[in-house]
């Protein structure tokens, strides 16, 4: 039986953990995180840095990916995101800043990176709600940026990104942020009013796109500062809707992925591509979007496009994330699954704990 996304009683039945509330909270997460960032501890010596590395995993790492996109447009120092147990060999010394990003404060990979950063004499900031990372930060008298929000890491994206944006702003390595935050909060509120469950499908673009993704294998394409947004859409489909999804990036995909658009023939009817676009894209990338769409059409692959809203890169980035979170939520309803639990991740952690 087809699921009616306009049936209000539907949502509490598959969402007992109220993931919807955390999605709706995004504008307030951004506002509150920005306020926290203005008063969080940051020694003046930290402003003498040449490089930033954000260490994290999963929902605690994506904020770093998103900040990287913003820094590539308006930043004055390079930023990289480290996922895993080992810092690159070139990261060492007090002119490099390591940011330990872990909502729980207990992520084993991030704890390993933190230990290495301290051993190598790097400046360190901890961004967390508590756990062992917070304990270590207090013991070592490191700047500790804490927030209190009861949700999964992926549902705390407003904090994990905006705290990092605030840190970059206070370090003096990212400009023009304060006005962008105000614009973003207002844009998110306006967008949300069009995407909530009480807005019927014919007037709700998130529900409409979710219907088009139902039963399909979605690919999300981004470019430039929206590259990490494509990754976010993919991981939200994985974790919320409990299904396969993938992502790719222009212009790189024009040099490889496009060659495989037509095969296997048995798979092509099940594919759908979503372009995540910006009016700030490079002019040649704008041309590439159109040609890529033509190639998909020639190979009988459905493609849709969504644009970020607002003027600033931050606003466009977060409005696309907000849209994608609602889309994944409605696909979750269509799939008949609970968006909150991540049983396979829990299983992995249990197995890993057995061999510590």
Predicted regions and their residues:
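Glycine-rich phosphate-binding loops that contact phosphosugars or nucleotide phosphates
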Residues: 46-193, 211, 278-300
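Short helix-capping/linker segments at secondary-structure and domain boundaries
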Residues: 35-37, 76, 167-177, 241-242, ...
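A generic structural motif
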Residues: 82-83, 243-254, 302-311
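Active-site phosphate/pyrophosphate-binding segments
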Residues: 15-22, 29, 37-41, 47-50, ...
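Short, small/acidic-rich helices and loops at N termini and domain boundaries
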Residues: 340-356
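C-terminal active-site/capping subdomain that shapes the small-molecule cofactor and substrate pocket
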Residues: 258-343
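Polybasic, low-complexity association/targeting segments
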Residues: 1-18
């Amino acid at each position: 039986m087809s699921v009616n996304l306009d049936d209000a009683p539907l949502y509490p039945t598959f969402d007992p953990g109220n993931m919807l509330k955390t999605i709706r909270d995004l504008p307030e997460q951004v506002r509150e995180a920005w306020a926290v960032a203005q008063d969080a501890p940051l020694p003046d010596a930290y402003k003498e840095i040449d490089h930033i590395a954000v260490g994290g995993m999963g929902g605690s790492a994506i904020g770093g990916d998103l900040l990287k996109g913003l820094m590539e447009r308006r930043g004055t120092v390079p930023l990289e995101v480290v996922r895993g147990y080992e810092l690159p060999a070139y990261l060492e010394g007090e002119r490099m800043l390591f940011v330990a990003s872990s909502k729980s404060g207990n992520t084993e990979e991030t704890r390993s990176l933190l230990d290495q950063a301290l051993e190598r004499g790097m400046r360190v900031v901890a961004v967390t709600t508590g756990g062992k990372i917070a304990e270590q930060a207090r013991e070592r008298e490191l700047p500790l940026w804490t927030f209190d929000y009861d949700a999964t890491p992926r549902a705390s994206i407003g904090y994990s990104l905006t705290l990092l944006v605030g840190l970059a702003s206070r370090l003096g390595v990212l400009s023009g942020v304060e006005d962008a935050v105000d614009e973003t909060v207002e844009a998110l509120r306006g967008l949300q009013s069009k995407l909530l469950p009480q807005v019927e499908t014919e007037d709700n673009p998130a529900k409409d796109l979710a219907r088009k993704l139902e039963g399909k294998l979605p690919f999300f394409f981004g470019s430039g500062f929206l590259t990490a947004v494509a990754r976010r859409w993919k991981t939200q489909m994985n974790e919320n809707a409990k299904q396969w999804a993938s992502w790719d990036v222009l212009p790189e995909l024009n040099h490889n992925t496009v060659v495989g658009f037509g095969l296997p023939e048995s798979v092509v009817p099940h594919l759908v591509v979503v372009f995540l676009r910006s009016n700030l894209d490079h002019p040649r990338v704008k041309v590439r979007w159109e040609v890529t769409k033509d190639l998909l059409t020639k190979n009988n692959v459905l493609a849709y496009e969504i644009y970020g809203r607002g003027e600033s890169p931050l606003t466009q980035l977060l409005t696309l994330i907000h849209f994608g979170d609602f889309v994944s939520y409605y696909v979750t309803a269509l799939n008949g699954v609970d968006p909150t639990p991540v049983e396979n991740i829990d299983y992995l952690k249990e197995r890993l704990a057995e061999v510590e």
